[in-house]
């Protein structure tokens, strides 16, 4: 089934572009996966969580250049999409941890393959630029 991901985009729900994206996501696994993964910083966050449970502060320090607002938004997006789990310990000071969900764990080996592919193809494509 199609998730709300594309409907949250800037496209009007009755626009041709929206309907095309929705149809593609409903019928193509790659397109569906990419709607979940597309967005600046999402892959970086998932990669950190692939390594293990992380807290907001450590992710903020480790992901160079990400703003607090963007990290907060992307964590919410990934949680809403079911790729990560947020655990709030309800303590003072606040303690919140993030980890991959079952769906996120299934993505973990694919992230490794994407990383390997990127490392392999980058020098080839960079020569062509």
Protein language model annotation of sequence segments:
Residues 21-70, 94-97, 128:
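N-terminal helix-turn-helix DNA-binding core of bacterial DNA-binding proteins
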Residues 2-17, 105-129:
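Amphipathic alpha-helical dimerization/coiled-coil segments
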Residues 71, 75-78:
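Basic amphipathic alpha-helical segments that dock to polyanions
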Residues 90-114:
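Basic, amphipathic "hinge/linker" alpha-helix immediately C-terminal to the N-terminal HTH DNA-binding motif
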């Amino acid at each position: 089934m199609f998730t709300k991901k594309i409907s949250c985009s800037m496209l009007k729900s009755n626009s041709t572009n929206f309907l095309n994206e929705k149809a593609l996501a409903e019928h193509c696994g790659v397109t569906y996966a990419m709607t979940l993964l597309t967005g600046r910083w999402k892959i970086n966050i998932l990669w950190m969580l692939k390594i293990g449970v992380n807290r907001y502060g450590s992710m903020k320090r480790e992901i160079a250049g990400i703003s607090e607002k963007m990290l907060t938004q992307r964590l919410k997006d990934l949680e809403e999409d079911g790729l990560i789990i947020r655990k709030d310990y309800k303590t003072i000071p606040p303690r919140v941890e993030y980890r991959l969900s079952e769906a996120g764990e299934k993505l973990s080996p694919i992230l490794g393959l994407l990383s390997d592919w990127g490392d392999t193809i980058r020098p080839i494509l960079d020569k062509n630029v």
